[in-house]
Amino acid sequence: MTGQPYLDLPRARQARGQVALPGSKSISNRVLLLAALAAGRTDISGLLDSDDTRVMLAALRQLGVELAEAGEGRVTVGGAGRFPVKQADLFLGNAGTAFRPLTAALALMGGQYRLSGVPRMHERPIGDLVDALRQWGARIDYLGQAGYPPLAVGEGRIRADAPARVQGAVSSQFLTALLLAAPVLAQGSDRPVVIEVAGELISKPYIEITLNLMARYGVQVRRDGWRTFTIEPGAAYRSPGAIAVEGDASSASYFLALGAIGGGPVRVTGVGADSIQGDVAFARTLADMGVQIDYGPDWIEARGVRVDQGGRLKAFDTDFNLIPDAAMTAAALALYADGPCRLRNIGSWRVKETDRIHAMHTELAKLGAEVESGPDWLRITPPADGGWRDAHIGTWDDHRMAMCFSLAAFGPAAVRILDPGCVSKTFPDYFDVYAGLVSGAPDSYDD
């Protein structure tokens, strides 16, 4: 679908079936970096095949890491604890899950590196991470606007004499980057490596993923609430031998949403009650909206209303600080609520692949919703009866915008998704999987 200018979505009426989820983006790129930094060989299964993971794989190859891809999400990584190549020019696209952690790891190892990305990556802030790394003696220079990529990383005087203090309110990826890289510093230190969080930490479930995976690779992090994180001197990553990547819980949200408005049942496999991903909590949000949710150890199932027959979801007023990615799916579902819906504490949307608050406001309004927004909130009043409007939905080069607005096909309007190929960032065949679950009246938009 890459390069296809638009996709016209047939009117959808019902959704049912089962989906085996692609691997988690958050877990995939963390596991790749951990395997590269660990002593020993790691056999990875279930790795996500997407733009973001390809960016990480390409960067690790440039840095001299031994990689063998066997297809179907299987990759073997030969880790050596440090990157063999000490000088490289890395292009990291718009992959924050690659750019931030690699910046931290390279800064603590030392060498001569240049890190850059697409124009949007150069608009995404990184100053809080750079400031924290400089407290450990890292040498990092901005090659453009201060506080933003591209970056030049040089040889610093690395030491753990004092804690690194990082702001927690902009992106949890800054803390994740520091945590993942901290054992590089701890290996040669005679004192603990300490990270302190200033302000409110957002997206805590993503930090839980990081800590869980670090433990799988032999490094235990001691934490005092969400304020202080300590890695003991001499800590070093060791390969677990083999590791399986869970299905992507953020991607699960779109299919569970289909079950919520298309009757269902829709079951996703690869995540469930035992998942380490915070976005599984989206299922509880659906339950609050009146959707029947059932769980197994590695599956979740949704049975909801038929909006094409007049069914409506319960309106919500929810703090989405912990699950900002899945919150986008909730915003799209607000089109089918029985009253105004409010999404709170979503300020991190402003610095994602696009300004998601502005983008979501713009595109929901095209469909006839009444939308208000602020620095960290959205208020959405569903289109009135007869108030839906045909729309060409801009995706803003944001994979999640494209996937969320596939849900608009259940409304009484013609929906065209522009640049549908942007889903390749995390889910290249999303629209094929979507089509396998949805049934309706193709090419007809009359009630």
From Swiss-Prot:
Active site: 325 (proton acceptor)
GO terms for cellular component: cytoplasm
Domain of life of the source: Bacteria
Keywords: Amino-acid biosynthesis, Aromatic amino acid biosynthesis, Cytoplasm, Transferase
GO molecular-function term, one example from the UniProt record: 3-phosphoshikimate 1-carboxyvinyltransferase activity
Keyword Amino-acid biosynthesis recorded: yes
Pfam families per the UniProt record, alphabetical: EPSP_synthase
Chief subcellular location: cytoplasm
Alphabetical list of SUPFAM superfamilies matching this protein: EPT/RTPC-like
Localization terms from the record: Cytoplasm
GO process terms (BP): amino acid biosynthetic process; aromatic amino acid family biosynthetic process; chorismate biosynthetic process
Subunit architecture: Monomer.
NCBIfam families in alphabetical order: aroA
Family according to the record: Belongs to the EPSP synthase family.
Protein name as annotated: 3-phosphoshikimate 1-carboxyvinyltransferase
Gene source species: Bordetella petrii (strain ATCC BAA-461 / DSM 12804 / CCUG 43448)
